[in-house]
Amino acid sequence: EDIIYERSNTWISPDSGTTSGSRQTLITGEACRRACGKLMEDKKAGLSVEDMIGKVYYAEYLAKTDPLGANVPNPVSHVAYGYATQVCILDSKTGKIEEIVAAHDVGKAVNPLSCEGQIEGGVVMSIGFALREKYPIDENCKPISKYGSLGLFRAHEIPKIDAIVIDKPGLKVACGAIGIGEITSIP
């Protein structure tokens, strides 16, 4: 009852940019960590919880990137870099995928179970896109197929996926989180 939860609203909170991939874990996570650090400084200085009631602990983190096509040496295009590798095991008779092993360096895994789910989802999306999905459109870019005929994998058709989350400190921000968004679509 002492905590007020507000939904995201740019009328009352600053715009933190797009929520894409794992960007918010990094950007918002680091801003939150910095604000918590300020609170902890007050606690170490002897302030009680009652003394801190009503005090605002605010921090920002801006991950600077260069504009696309910037004429600068060593342009920065992403806030975080990860690493992933996959092994695809095929049935030698049918050519079908039996299993995919996908290992991803995510820095510090803030939510390991979510990381596994993100890897599995990215693998399914990638093999569907690579092997059988079609999204036909007409000359006006209007879809001409029904959802059920797009070639999406059904649950019973998905091969075994062994998602390996490599959890180790990454960047010196956001408690070491790197990200797990886009890189899962590599296979």
At which residue positions do the language-model features occur?
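C-terminal catalytic domains of large/alpha subunits in multi-subunit enzymes
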Residues: 1-187
